[in-house]
């Protein structure tokens, strides 16, 4: 079945056939910078690891789409053979653009669920209600962390929003972005409002441990995961007590979903399957199994398919069997730039200029090194590149203005990798979510193909809110 629904055109996307005609078949060295590059082989590998880990542990998985904002990568995140498509989005526009594919999934007999992952703003209700009518009852879930959210939704009639509206109660487990503490009166008030409403139903309990980005080892990431899981369990128990409901060990009863994760803690679960049966690993695995008997534990994450320098700095998970930690080979996203100027005698460090500043890369720091991006060894895959955990010798983006980026050589001057005006370079960005947002589309290559430099496809990113 082909859906007739199209997303509102206030932020129109670029014409895909024109982009494909322009780019497919070209080599990366012939592309005009700046450009956003994805490696499909790395994406497949990262997505497979996450799905394998959650399936092996017997927990659910919900893919966040905010990083990439593409249908193609959302499909990789959930897996081609899945029977359940569970997603979370940060903007209404993301859901609008996913709607045609979700309808296609429904026509194939797959169950679908998508959450609007920001506590409800009343102004979004008309667009969300329109989506709920298109997708069907119970598909679109709404975040709440205040009783007024429940009251606002309770005033929406069924002709506007069919069926009971699933709400996901957001528990604050220490990140202090959104959510309410598990022992708060505000959480109890949400529970009472839910009990009094005939229009909403409990979809699940949710937590996001964004401060897990500060971890520096697999063990530390697992510790954050355990804290997040137990905090979410406590919030769920407190909430259910106020609604006169309770968790159940009955295998035939429908369990309440507990959804937790950020990419570091979500990737940390791979360490539960690493084969190293340490006391701490066994304890975290036992906690997960215990809670999963009473609730339906679900992991959510978003940036893990593409990864970036912030994520490699967490060292939250190994890159594969026998590996100790994530490597640069696990980063699927790179930014193509061109050298605009060279300044070998400007200061103690050789410098160069690229036409790519904070508008291109963002201004978010990375704890493992003092810059905003690292120059990769592309295209020859030889020569020195800066490794925060190794030699710390190579080119980094050391300073950014709006459209200017200054490359700094770090390490001994005699080892400098010479740069020339007009030379094209690839950068690993600090934060893929921010750097990707500055582009209208990705150029997709595949390192498992005979020529890994050839553009195989163009994936257009959704725009707007």
Show the residue positions of the predicted features.
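Active-site loop/helix belt of alpha/beta enzymes
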Residues: 166, 172-323
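N-terminal, Lys/Arg-enriched amphipathic/low-complexity engagement segments
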Residues: 24-36, 40-41, 46-57
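C-terminal accessory subdomain/extension
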Residues: 344-465
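Alpha-helix-loop-beta-strand connector modules within alpha/beta enzyme cores
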Residues: 50, 56, 78, 108-111, ...
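Conserved, mostly hydrophobic/aromatic
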Residues: 43, 66, 98, 169, ...
């Amino acid at each position: 079945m082909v859906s007739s629904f199209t997303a509102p055109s206030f932020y129109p996307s670029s014409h895909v056939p024109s982009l494909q005609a322009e780019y497919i078949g070209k080599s990366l060295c012939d592309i005009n910078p700046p450009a956003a590059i994805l490696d499909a082989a790395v994406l497949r590998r990262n997505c497979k690891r996450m799905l394998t880990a959650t399936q092996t542990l017997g927990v659910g998985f919900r893919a966040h789409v905010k990083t990439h904002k593409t249908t193609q990568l959302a499909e990789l995140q959930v897996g081609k053979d899945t029977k359940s498509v569970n997603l979370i989005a940060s903007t209404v526009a993301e859901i609008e653009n996913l709607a045609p594919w979700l309808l296609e999934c429904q026509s194939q007999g797959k169950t679908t669920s998508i959450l609007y992952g920001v506590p409800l703003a009343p102004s979004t209700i008309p667009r969300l209600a329109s989506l709920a009518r298109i997708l069907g009852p119970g598909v679109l879930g709404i975040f709440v962390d205040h009783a007024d959210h429940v009251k606002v939704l309770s005033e929406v009639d069924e002709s506007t929003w069919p069926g009971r509206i699933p709400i996901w109660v957001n528990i604050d487990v220490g990140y202090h972005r959104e959510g309410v503490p598990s022992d708060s009166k505000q959480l109890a008030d949400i529970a009472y409002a839910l009990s009094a409403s005939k229009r909403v139903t409990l979809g699940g309990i949710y937590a996001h441990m964004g401060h897990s980005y500060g971890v520096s080892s697999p063990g530390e990431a697992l510790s954050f995961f355990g804290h997040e899981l137990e905090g979410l369990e406590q919030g769920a128990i407190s909430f259910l007590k106020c609604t006169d409901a309770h968790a159940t060990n009955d295998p035939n009863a429908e369990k309440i979903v507990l959804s937790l994760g950020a990419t570091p803690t979500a990737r940390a679960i791979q360490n539960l399957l690493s084969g190293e049966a340490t006391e701490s690993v066994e304890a975290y695995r036992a906690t997960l199994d215990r809670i999963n008997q009473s609730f339906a534990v679900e992991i959510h994450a978003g940036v893990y398919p593409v990864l970036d320098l912030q994520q490699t700095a967490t060292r939250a998970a190994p890159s594969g069997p026998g590996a100790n930690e994530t490597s640069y080979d696990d980063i699927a996203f790179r930014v193509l730039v061109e050298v605009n100027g060279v300044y070998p005698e400007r200061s103690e460090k050789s410098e160069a200029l690229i036409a790519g500043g904070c508008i291109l890369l963002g201004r978010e720091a990375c704890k493992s090194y003092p810059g905003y991006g690292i120059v990769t060894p592309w295209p020859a895959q030889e020569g020195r590149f800066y490794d925060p955990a190794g030699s710390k010798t190579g080119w980094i983006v050391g300073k950014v203005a709006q459209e200017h980026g200054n490359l700094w050589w770090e390490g001994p001057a005699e080892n400098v990798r010479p740069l020339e005006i007009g030379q094209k370079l690839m950068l690993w960005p600090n934060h893929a979510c921010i750097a990707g947002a500055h582009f209208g589309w990705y150029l997709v290559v595949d390192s498992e193909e005979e020529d890994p430099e050839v553009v195989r496809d163009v994936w257009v990113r959704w725009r707007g809110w």
